[in-house]
Amino acid sequence: MRALWIVAVLLVGVEGSLVEFETLIMKIAGRSGISYYSSYGCYCGAGGQGWPQDASDRCCFEHDCCYAKLTGCDPTTDVYTYRQEDGEIVCGGDDPCGTQICECDKAAAICFRDSMNTYDYKYLRFSPENCQGESQPC
């Protein structure tokens, strides 16, 4: 029961549709975004400051930058749809904002998959104290 409560807390107040993003990460990278990336490095999870610690953390940095470039969209509330065609994720639907958010999430999931060999457990639950200083620009 306690584990369900923790998951419920994680699902509240996180940028984007965490359920959709988690599903994309599972489909593309084959691993749980919540388990591996909800608190990793300087950029995976809430906020972000300093420099990305490795390629996996850079995926989260790029994801934050992708969201920052969206105009007139709110990744915290807008939802999206996608489909699979020949094993590929295709973002779509009638909502242009949803499609853009989906593309950001898809790019991050692909990045996680492609940088899996650089994942380093020393950055899991990385202290924000190690992420001080000026942030890298997008």
Curated annotation (Swiss-Prot):
Subcellular localization(s) per the UniProt record: Secreted
Keywords: Disulfide bond, Neurotoxin, Presynaptic neurotoxin, Pyrrolidone carboxylic acid, Secreted, Signal, Toxin
Cofactor note: Binds 1 Ca(2+) ion.
SUPFAM superfamilies membership: Phospholipase A2, PLA2
Tissue expression summary: Expressed by the venom gland.
Modified residues (Pyrrolidone carboxylic acid): 84
Record-level GO BP terms: arachidonate secretion; lipid catabolic process; negative regulation of T cell proliferation; phospholipid metabolic process
GO molecular function terms attached to this record: calcium ion binding; calcium-dependent phospholipase A2 activity; phospholipid binding; toxin activity
Disulfide-bonded cysteines: 42-131, 44-60, 59-111, 65-138, 66-104, 73-97, 91-102
Keyword Amino-acid biosynthesis: no
Record-linked InterPro entries: PLipase_A2 (IPR001211), PLipase_A2_Asp_AS (IPR033112), PLipase_A2_dom (IPR016090), PLipase_A2_dom_sf (IPR036444), PLipase_A2_His_AS (IPR033113)
Signal peptide: 1-40
Required cofactor(s): Ca(2+)
GO CC terms, sorted: extracellular region
Residues excised as propeptide: 81-83, 120-126
Family: Belongs to the phospholipase A2 family. Group II subfamily. D49 sub-subfamily.
Purpose of the protein: Snake venom phospholipase A2 (PLA2) that inhibits neuromuscular transmission by blocking acetylcholine release from the nerve termini.
Quaternary data: Heterodimer of an acidic and a basic chain. The acidic subunit is non-toxic, without enzymatic activity and comprises 3 peptides that are cross-linked by 5 disulfide bridges. The basic subunit is toxic, has phospholipase A2 activity and is composed of a single chain.
Entry protein name: Phospholipase A2 homolog mojave toxin acidic chain
Species name: Crotalus scutulatus scutulatus
Highest classification ranks of the organism: Eukaryota, Metazoa, Chordata, Craniata, Vertebrata
